[in-house]
Swiss-Prot record:
Catalytic function, reaction form: 4-CDP-2-C-methyl-D-erythritol + ATP = 4-CDP-2-C-methyl-D-erythritol 2-phosphate + ADP + H(+)
Superkingdom classification of source: Bacteria
GO molecular function ontology, one term from the record: 4-(cytidine 5'-diphospho)-2-C-methyl-D-erythritol kinase activity
Pathway as given in its UniProt record: Isoprenoid biosynthesis; isopentenyl diphosphate biosynthesis via DXP pathway; isopentenyl diphosphate from 1-deoxy-D-xylulose 5-phosphate: step 3/6
UniProt similarity note: Belongs to the GHMP kinase family. IspE subfamily.
Protein name (Swiss-Prot/TrEMBL): 4-diphosphocytidyl-2-C-methyl-D-erythritol kinase
Functional description taken from the UniProt entry: Catalyzes the phosphorylation of the position 2 hydroxy group of 4-diphosphocytidyl-2C-methyl-D-erythritol.
Record-linked HAMAP family: IspE
UniProt-listed GO biological process terms: isopentenyl diphosphate biosynthetic process, methylerythritol 4-phosphate pathway; terpenoid biosynthetic process
EC number: 2.7.1.148
Keywords: ATP-binding, Isoprene biosynthesis, Kinase, Nucleotide-binding, Transferase
Sequence positions that bind ATP: P94, M95, G96, G97, G98, I99, G100, G101, G102, S103, S104
Residue spans crossing the bilayer: none
């Protein structure tokens, strides 16, 4: 049985400003997404009977509610294909960590199955379908670091520096709904007028609320903050700090390992998923 194995990379919100709240309850954001060379891995095998089967169950997530299954079925339905797939997940990224695990898995599923099912779908169409699954899915479908506006779906490619990061993973899952509904959340940051998007003098507007409500996150920020500027990604719980070399990042993580769990990863403006897909295209055309 031939299988297609692809990564589902993590992302960081290098900063995140909330500039308003819409009538439908969603928040207007401005943020910069950058990928990490670290993530989940998914394997896909073609089925002729139309069945979508995820062989790796995730605790507390019913099979039919999993974003991987939902993405596969939505693509199947909208494309009209009679084909199905067996799917296996190697889960590395934490749930509720703010590094995009579920959204990235969904995007990898869309791109993988469009390839396996030989669908004539371009990136725009896959990204639009991805948006119906979650606001962060389109950036993973497109695979380029981006300045995002709206609810996070209006994407402009950017190329920030690509440092090494220490990412700490507090052993707590932060509820995005809880954070975005919190009365003390800043919702009136001024929209950016500058282009290109500045990299300095920024923040994550969710961070004060998360720090206040999740002491594990506050402790991680304080620990990493002794070595570099530490910041929350997304609504958390993961926090990150940048370093100029892998050696320095590894050293800091080792110093924190007695009290913190985390990993070191390279920032990347082109996702490792897209680099892998590009290599597959080159092989098939060679």
């Amino acid at each position: 049985m031939h299988t297609l194995t692809l990564p589902a990379p993590a992302k960081l919100n290098l900063w995140l400003h909330i500039i308003g709240r819409r009538a439908d309850g969603y928040h207007e954001l401005e943020t910069v997404f950058q990928f990490l060379d670290h993530g989940d891995e998914l394997s896909f095998a073609l089925r002729e009977d139309g069945v979508i089967r995820l062989h790796t169950e995730i605790e507390a997530v019913p099979h039919d509610s999993n974003l991987i299954v939902r993405a596969a079925r939505k693509l199947q339905e909208q494309s009209g294909t009679a084909l199905g797939a067996d799917i296996w997940l190697t889960k590395v990224l934490p749930m509720g960590g703010g590094i995009g695990g579920g959204s990235s898995d969904a995007a990898t599923t869309l791109l993988a199955l469009a390839h396996l099912w030989q669908l004539d779908w371009d990136e725009d169409r896959l990204a639009a379908l991805g948006l119906s699954l979650g606001a962060d899915v389109p950036v993973f479908v497109r695979g380029h670091a981006a300045f995002a506006q709206g609810v996070g779906e209006q994407l402009t490619p950017v190329d920030p520096i690509e440092p090494w990061y220490v990412v700490l993973v507090p052993q707590v899952s932060v509820s995005t709904v809880e954070i975005f509904s919190h009365p003390q959340l800043t919702r009136d940051s001024l929209p950016l007028k500058m282009r290109p998007v500045p990299e300095g003098n920024s923040r994550n507007d969710c961070q004060p609320v998360v720090e206040q409500n999740y002491p594990e996150v506050r402790n991680a920020l304080n620990s990493l903050g002794k070595f570099t500027e530490a910041r929350l990604t997304g609504t958390g719980s993961c926090v990150f700090g940048a370093f100029p070399s892998k050696a320095e990042a590894d050293k800091v993580l080792a110093l924190l390992s007695a009290t913190q769990t985390g990993f070191v990863a390279k920032g990347s403006n082109i996702s490792m998923l897209h680099r892998k897909l590009q290599s597959l295209v080159k092989k098939s055309s060679a």
